[in-house]
Each structure stands twice: as structure tokens, then as C-alpha cells.
Amino acid sequence: MGWLFLKVLLAGVSFSGFLYPLVDFCISGKTRGQKPNFVIILADDMGWGDLGANWAETKDTANLDKMASEGMRFVDFHAAASTCSPSRASLLTGRLGLRNGVTRNFAVTSVGGLPLNETTLAEVLQQAGYVTGIIGKWHLGHHGSYHPNFRGFDYYFGIPYSHDMGCTDTPGYNHPPCPACPQGDGPSRNLQRDCYTDVALPLYENLNIVEQPVNLSSLAQKYAEKATQFIQRASTSGRPFLLYVALAHMHVPLPVTQLPAAPRGRSLYGAGLWEMDSLVGQIKDKVDHTVKENTFLWFTGDNGPWAQKCELAGSVGPFTGFWQTRQGGSPAKQTTWEGGHRVPALAYWPGRVPVNVTSTALLSVLDIFPTVVALAQASLPQGRRFDGVDVSEVLFGRSQPGHRVLFHPNSGAAGEFGALQTVRLERYKAFYITGGARACDGSTGPELQHKFPLIFNLEDDTAEAVPLERGGAEYQAVLPEVRKVLADVLQDIANDNISSADYTQDPSVTPCCNPYQIACRCQAA
């Protein structure tokens, strides 16, 4: 109890005009040059085809494309799940949802979050002497000890969950459109079933709500400012740092940008991509001007585009899941089709990561945890097993193919949440359950069980259009190995130290800075 009180007390101490916990940035610089810094940037609902370096039709990612030319681009990189909370939990633990307990999204009223017996990447690096910060969306529990300040992050600035989970006065663009927060004593204007609640979206700095509702139009620039301030302060101190930037882009609602250089004539989605790219460019520029030689920057996404948002959703590129679209529904976010989990990914570290390299290694967001831990000269937590692996050899251009096998869990489209219903085995992909998420036209594909899995050869069929013939030699050669690797991982999980998330809901835990005001309004700090 005393430790908890101390953490709460320290989290509110102010330095240089913005809140920081009482982190000793001024410890001796003896670690400088010995341990690398890490900046991990995670986009939200960004499609594989939204990166210009991946897909020539995209023209709005100049900074990311430049990063690709200055580093390594991964074209077979996968989120660990196809929706928000499970993907983020796997990034921070290196473990699938069946191990870490997070198999579906947390709500505004969620009592729990990422189970407290799971060790986060931030906690490991904090113990190794790192200063740790998160800027952006958390979505792994906001109540009590689930808050990021108690999960290894010294500094937090951001929103506790997706920005469509609370109203704002700057609602931006959504499909269907959503109203602004109610004003004064007026009745609720939230009549759309798909729109957020009338409780305003909060913006946190550490444990304090500093703005409710948050201004979505200026949020990206605030993130850029806080991220660059954190990098400057940490680099000046001589201590190594971990900065995790979890962007609001490209999740809906798309903001009305306030950046003065915003281009005209682009689509709403293209303008959002441009703003996101500008934000990433500001962070990279700060790294380049302060800690370039000793900082590893990793950019990727949490899952594929949210197709039901129609023109406000991104591009899956060539990964169109054509077999599923013929059945109905979307093969993107929430599904185990390639469009749901194959995401853009870039690595940048001058002098360490080779320049202008395209890697076809099979990699995953799960690999971030063990790779960063290894590069930080830290140790993996004991008493548990990990699904990610250290991929340093791939990053540094040495010979290593990455994973031979990946497992894709159900993220809401079909089957039981978290169930490993799809197996990637080298070039092959086997589906034991298929189903589409809600598409722009409102359709959802039927949930279909496949005792004999559908198997696609992704090298020949990136669109996942035509499965192998069940009686053919190629299918018969692959099937036994698919069955074996799936049985092996399920047995491994059964023998592991696994966790269970608390998905209990209670309206009293809803973040609210002023319960006496409609929509929980309070003044911005």
C-alpha cells in the first residue's frame, strides 16, 4: 500500500512545464554508449498498402518511405492479433493472448486489464536502468494498478483506449458520422448505434486527466511535442530510454488536421495518412538530431484496416482475401486473413540496420519484446514461455529467415476469442475456421468450420483466392506438418504459466475528471 501511494505521489510532480514522475534523469552517464535507446511506434488500423514503400498507389507517406530507404522494410510482418488490446498485449509481453490472457478488447468500464502477473517490456527495461515512456493509446486497462504508470512506464501521456470510445467536441470523420459531446443540460445527441458514449474521451498525463474531452484536431501535434520532449530529456540525462508511441492514426474518427502545411485535394483518409506520417517524421528528426547513432526505431501497426468504415478505411494492398469476399464480409481487421494481420513494418538504426533493404523474413510483433530485451542486455522474465524470438540477426542483415511458423488467433470475426484457428507454415497458410468481419456493405461472412483446413500457398496466391486441392499431393504433404505444429503449440500453452484477464465491467471505473458536469467535462491543463 505504501508503494502504491508513493507511485501516485511521484507521478504528479512537475518538471519544466509538463508532468513527469520523479525519474532520476540525472543519474551518471556511465550507461551512455553502452545500451541502445528504443523508439517503438505503433500505428492503429493501418493497412499494409497504406505505406507507399509497400504499395505504389499510396502517395501520402513520404517520411516513412524515406525511413524505408534508410533502413529495413519488412514485407511479411504480422500483428499478433487482428484487434487492438490483444495485439498491444502481445507486443508488450512477447506472448500470444492464450498465454497473457488478453484475447479481446477492454471497454471504457473495464475493471481489469493486462493481467498483473504478466511482465511488460517496460518493466524489464526499467529494471535494466532505462527511462521508460508511453505516448498515445494504452487500451490495456486504466483502472487502479492496470494504469501504464504501474506497468513499467515512468511517463504516460495519452488516451486510455481507442478514441472512438468517448465523445469529443471535435468528432472528426466517422462512418456513420458521430455527434459532438452534449453541451450544458441539453439531451444526448448520440442516437447512432455505432457511435461512442456521451462520456467524453479523456487525455491523461501520468495519473491525471488533463483534458476531457480531448481535442482530436490537436492531438497528433501534442503527441509529437511530448515525444520529442521525452527524447530530449532522456538523451540529455545520459540514461538509455524506451519510448513507446501508440498513435491514434489511422483509427476512426479521422481528425480534422490543424497542421498548417496539410495538403489540399487529398481524400479524408489520405489527409489522415499525411498527418500521421508528419508526426512520425517529427519523432525521427528528433532522434536524428540527438541520439541517432545509438537509437533503434521500430515502426509497425497493431492490425489491418477496419473495412466497415468504407472510404475511411485503409488499403490491404494485394492481400484481398478473395476466398472470403466471395462468401461475404471483410477479410481485414478482426479476421485471420492476411489483410487482418499483415502490417507495415520498418526498422531504422544508422550503422547497425542495413540501408534500403527489403526483408522477406517471416516476423511478428511478438518479436519486439525478446529482440529489445536482448539488445538492452537484459533478461527475459523467468517461469514463462514466449512466442516471439530475438530477430537481431535479421535486423542486422545476417542470414536468418525469421519464423518457420506463426499462429493467428481469432480476433472477433469467427470462432472463440483468442483461439489459434489459423496456422502459417513457411509459404503455406491453413484455416480451421473462416469468417469475415463486417464489411462496408454491412455483410458478414458465415462462420465455417473446416475439419480439413483450407490451405493456401501464399507465394502463388497472395489474394488467398483458391485453396489447394484437398486430394492433391501438395495439400497431402503439408497437412501433417500443419497438424503437428498446431498440436505442439497447444500442448506448450497447456504446460505454460498462463494468465487470465479480468473482463468485468463496472460503470464506476469510467474515467471522469468532473462527474458533476455533463460528459465529465473539465478544463484543459
From Swiss-Prot:
Pfam family membership, one: Sulfatase_C
Enzyme Commission code: 3.1.6.1, 3.1.6.15
Sites where a glycan is attached: N117, N215, N356, N497
Keyword entries, A-Z: Calcium, Deafness, Disease variant, Disulfide bond, Glycoprotein, Hydrolase, Lysosome, Metal-binding, Retinitis pigmentosa, Signal, Usher syndrome
Transmembrane segments: none
Temperature dependence: Most efficient at 45-50 degrees Celsius.
Enzyme class: hydrolase
Location in or out of the cell: Lysosome
GO CC terms in record: endoplasmic reticulum; endoplasmic reticulum lumen; extracellular space; lysosome
Residues the record lists as binding substrate: K137, S162, H251
Biological function: Displays arylsulfatase activity at acidic pH towards artificial substrates, such as p-nitrocatechol sulfate and also, but with a lower activity towards p-nitrophenyl sulfate and 4-methylumbelliferyl sulfate. Catalyzes the hydrolysis of the 3-sulfate groups of the N-sulfo-D-glucosamine 3-O-sulfate units of heparin.
PANTHER family membership: ARYLSULFATASE FAMILY MEMBER (PTHR42693), ARYLSULFATASE G (PTHR42693:SF42)
Disease: Usher syndrome 4: A form of Usher syndrome, a genetically heterogeneous condition characterized by the association of retinitis pigmentosa with sensorineural deafness. Age at onset and differences in auditory and vestibular function distinguish different types of Usher syndrome. USH4 is characterized by late onset of retinitis pigmentosa and usually late-onset of progressive sensorineural hearing loss without vestibular involvement. USH4 inheritance is autosomal recessive.
The name this protein goes by in its record: Arylsulfatase G
Gene: ARSG
